[in-house]
UniProtKB/Swiss-Prot annotation:
Single GO BP term: DNA restriction-modification system
Catalytic machinery residues: 75
Protein name: Type II methyltransferase M.HgiCI
A GO MF label: DNA binding
Enzyme nomenclature, EC number: 2.1.1.37
Record-linked Pfam families: DNA_methylase
Annotated SAM-dependent MTase C5-type domain residues: 2-417
UniProt keyword annotation of Signal present: no
Family affiliation: Belongs to the class I-like SAM-binding methyltransferase superfamily. C5-methyltransferase family.
Gene: hgiCIM
Amino acid sequence: MLKFIDLFAGIGGMRLGFEQAMHELGIETACVLSSEIDKHAQTTYAMNFHEQSQGDITQIQDFPSFDFLLAGFPCQPFSYAGKQKGFGDTRGTLFFEIERILKAYRPKGFLLENVRGLTTHDKGRTFKTILQKLHELNYGVYLILNSSNFQVPQNRLRVYIVGLDQSQPELTITSHIGATDSHKFKQLSNQASLFDTNKIMLVRDILEDHPLDKYNCSTDFVNKLLAFIGHPIKLNGKRLIDYRNGNSIHSWELGIKGECTSDEIQFMNALIANRRKKHFGAHQDGKKLTIEQIKTFFEHDDLDSIMQSLITKGYLQEVNGRFNPVAGNMSFEVFKFLDPDSVSITLVSSDAHKIGVVHQNRIRRITPRECARLQGFPDSFQFHPKDSLAYRQFGNSVSVPVVKAVILDLFKSADLASCF
């Protein structure tokens, strides 16, 4: 019997992947403690595992005996924690809770999961401190994996840190990293999944056939989209956002805040196409430009009236004589339409509910069940009855098949199955 604890458990994605791996290896398991501070996530966890998670990990002092630790912990800067000791002190952070538990209970192994940004967070000091602390405990090795390589049609890069007591695991698993910008990721047709080499999963594989009408985009929004783009299939892969050019649709092209003339549309498109050029400044998302700078790439006899009209409609803003788009994607019902023949952008908790798809002649948002499938959750998994919470929870979760694959690799490479 292998006993494990599930910390920062969320809705149980790591536990699910771990238990699937153990079942495949023929190892009986028991979760002896789970901890999750969010009460709504606790509800979903209880619905699926029929156990009530304990709350705040910092308030749990005594743990039952266990062999393995699972944790998807939040990312926090260590250089600001424990000011008395300065850099390298992990006190006051949630990783410290993992550190104290590992030190006190010395489990056989662990799996930690975090965002890819952990490796560069606080100029790399956060990750360096984590690895240093684990090394001091004689634990730890890490890898970066993309969910799209594990029978999950989602571009999701995550850091997985695994450890064995008094041993350095030698993992064989690897992953194609893909594009840094999730919107630019395109799965290669010859790129086999490391989880199932016989099939590459695409968005179309996870779509529901008859989702409820409540997931349809509004008639007004659909009409605006079709008036601009023509055939619905042209929406595949399109991004709806006002501060980027490229394969994007903009609010002024749809008339979201008010219909625009062709001259006004041309002006706004020229502005976002040129404002990021280096000779205007090195700002990542573009610099506010003066009228003189704007005239270097857009000439029109009625330029002043065009710009004033756009300011009045809410597409353009002026700050101290400089101009910039009123940027963002919050004005759209959907900010990205998935390409059914590719993989999804990364699900995140804040806007998983605003991802769209064109399927069976319907222009709609993806459903909570489709979000679950993008994370590799089985259809037997029950999601929260409130859609807004279900979207957020799946955006916060882990990709179940990746956890399963990492655990299988760890146990097979270290011959751990014989220990339980």
